[in-house]
Amino acid sequence: PSLVGSEMCIRDSYFFFGRSRRRERIIGQKIYNRLLNKPMVEYLAQDATTLPMAYSRLISLFRNTTQAFPFDGNRIEIYTNGGSMLQSLLRELQNARQHIHIEFYIFEDDAIGRMVRDVLVEKARAGVEVRLIYDDVGCWHVPNRFYDEMLSAGIEVRSFLKVRFPLFTSKVNYRNHRKIVVIDGRVGFIGGMNLAERYMRGFSWGIWRDTHLLLEGKAVHGLQTAFLLDWYFVDRTLISASRYFPKMEATGTSLVQIVTSDPIGPWKEIMQGLSMAISGAKKYFYIQTPYFLPTEQILAAMQTAALAGVDVRLMLPMRADNRLTHLGSCSYLADILQAGVKIYFYKKGFLHSKLMVSDDELSTVGSTNVDFRSFEHNFEVNAFIYDTETALQMREIFLQDQRDCVQVFLKNWVKRPWWRKAAESVVRLMAPLL
């Protein structure tokens, strides 16, 4: 069953040109339209794209709220550890000929960060345009000298929402949690990994388990648009030349939407999409997240799906990198166990993966955690993939991780010590702030 994408062009045009939103008022309607014009033209120029009927409403939701155009013919590589992702990233950076756009929440001054920085410097000195956005809070402890060599090589470096006095400004709440790399407008990276040693080497007590993607194809237009909107936000420079959106032939078979969410628009796009996807699941919906502080909307969707007989599974780290957040996460588990959600604690190390997969058809990977901060306060980005081959790979990754888990059962979970339950309840009150 299918839906022909070209049937929605009129509605696409309305939502593209007709919506008045706070985000557009901040960035400027004309700027917003110009930045989105190139990917829209490429989207409309596609052959009549066959969209999966089961997800036509989800695809429409993302198009109507974030102008996230669904592009087909993409190739996807999945990385489940930092070493393989870093190796691929360095290789693709070395292959850059025209431009590199790179955006991370954390870009650490350590062996891994310096390795990537040195490649960026080398490419900039060879004439490649390089632009970097880092989050000011995520990189709070990174010394200025780390960026000096990049600046001296001609790399344009910008911090996102610079914070001078973190204890006295609300800006500290609104952080850019995105992880985006775009190379020559043709290859992109998106996922949960930042640039720091711990993402590659883990901790003394276990590995760092994460998920990241390489995308090749027109879906990179979505990553490019997200980066250039953020670049305009931090630099007030409009970059929209055609060379940043090259014409491409199909390199694979995956249909992909790049979906962003932020605290300055009227919608909670990724949260709304996940709620719809969970509610629409027919057979199963599997979730990996390092933190589980769900909004009422997500909590209700998970409970309702499980009560309706859908196999809903949640995988969390047994040991987290933030004890408060982990306590808060644990406070919600009885609520979903009672509804029949299966819960697994990953015991091999720290699970930082933000992977979800459903019904062998839909999967998503990105920067978004299942928590208030990601849904309400952060600038986030996810790839939503409508493709059976990719979904089966994601499902196998989840099931492989499940072998390194211990399952949580309600009859045992309710026997936690009273002081543990009390601590969880107190932290839960602070969930929107964590």
Model-found features: residue ranges?
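Helical hairpin unit composed of two closely spaced alpha helices linked by a short loop
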Residues: 281-283, 291-313, 317-322
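A general structural signal for well-ordered alpha-helical packing
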Residues: 271, 278, 299, 312, ...
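A beta-strand-loop signature enriched in Asp, Gly, Thr, and Trp
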Residues: 308, 312-358
